[in-house]
Each structure stands twice: as structure tokens, then as C-alpha cells.
Amino acid sequence: MKPRFESSLANRAAQVVITLAGLALFLAIRPDIYASVSNRLMSDYQRKVVTPKLISDYMQRSREPKLQVGAGLNNADGWLNSDIEPSATQAYIDITERLPFHDMTLHAILGEQVIEHVTYEEGFRFFREAWRVLAPGGKLRVITPNLLSFVALFSDQKPPAYMARKLDFHYWPADTPDPACFIINGEMRSWGHQFVYTPKMLRASLEKAGFADVRQYAPGVTDDPDFKAVEVRAKTEWKDLNDFDSMAFEATR
């Protein structure tokens, strides 16, 4: 006769095996739930394990730490690249949350085609956070759609080449009687856009966040070599679209 504790241990082991087998069968029947659970576990691991290590390692080895938010596929050398859907080499950073850095520790922050994906209030909080974590003299560069460019599509000065290229690029109906209507609706509603700025509104938000020196540039144009090296859309097939419909602002702490 087996001792009671051995029998109890065997029973628990059997229960665990049965439970795991049942879970495996359920997940096999419902792959959608399996995918959801798997993605959640990977996301938690990325946020709680991978990201803190990436940030710690980068901050230790970098003399002038630079952060890129919403990096996507643009893994820039010498920068801490981050995204809300990061890869193994990117940190998980959500710009609507508190930035995971001490006060006055970063040299530069870049957000290319990012700020329009959050609300105005969330964008302002990000600007405040950027001001907090930038060292004195540190810069934030923001590239984002310019609402005035889309308003201009309804004027007599609208550029036909841009409109044709935009409609073709985004597969909107080229035979529409009012292409500008499709374009401006796309900019305001598609790709997760939440708030599209005018130059006046973006400048005011940056200054309200605490930045004293705020300057506007054309996309791809900057006096800072760090930003010049990493900004990507001004060097791609989207350059002609980017040049017309986007604006860049640099704000110094």
C-alpha cells in the first residue's frame, strides 16, 4: 500500500495532466482563442521582460540616448527604437502612457507619422512627457500630416498630380467627381488617425507643454544630423506625397 502523501501527489499530477490535456483540446478546437491567449502572453512578456532589458542596456551604453517612438520597420542605428507593436529588437512604448525614463535623461525624441494616431489630449500628454524626459537642450521632432494641405485640395490651387497619385496609391476610386472628398476623409478616419493638426495647433500644443524654442521644417529638412539620418519617409516612394501633405516641427527643451 502506497503512503498517503505519495497517493495524493500522484492524484494531483493526474489532475494536472487531465487539465492540460483538456486545455490543449479546447485550444485546438478554438484556434482564435489560442491566438488571443498566445498574443496576450507574448505582449506581457515583451512589456515586462524584453522592454525593461532593452531600455536598461541601451541607456547604459549610450552617451546621448535617443528615442524613436512608432518606429515600425525603421530600426535606426544608435537609437532606442520602440513601437506599440514591437519586434524582438524594439521596446514596447505606448505614447499615451508615462514614458519609462527618468527626468532629463534623453538627448532626442523622434515621432514620424505617429502623433495623429492619438487624440489631442493624449498627444498633449505625450508632449509633456517628452519635455520631462528630455535633457536641457534636448529636441523633440514630430512629423505629421498638415490639415491645411488637405483643405487646400478644395481650392483652385489644388495640385492635380498629388491628387491622382494619392488616389492611385490608396486605391480610392479614380473616377470620383470629388477626389478631395475621399482624400480628406481618409486622412481624418483611416489608418487609426485620431487628430490631424494645423501648424498653428501643433505649435501651440508644443509650447503649452513647456517647449520654448519651436520651429517648423519641411519633411526631411532639419539642422540636426541625428534626425536627418533616421527620418525615413522623405527617402522613400512616398516622398512626393510626404512633401506636400506633411509638416515637421522641432521643439527644444
Where are these regions (language model features)?
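Membrane-proximal basic amphipathic "stem/tether" segments
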Residues: 1-62
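SAM-dependent nucleic-acid methyltransferase catalytic core
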Residues: 36-74, 222-232, 237-244
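Short, conserved clusters of charged catalytic residues that mark active-site
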Residues: 49-53, 93, 125, 197
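S-adenosyl-L-methionine-dependent methyltransferase catalytic module, highlighting the catalytic core
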Residues: 122-131, 135, 139-252
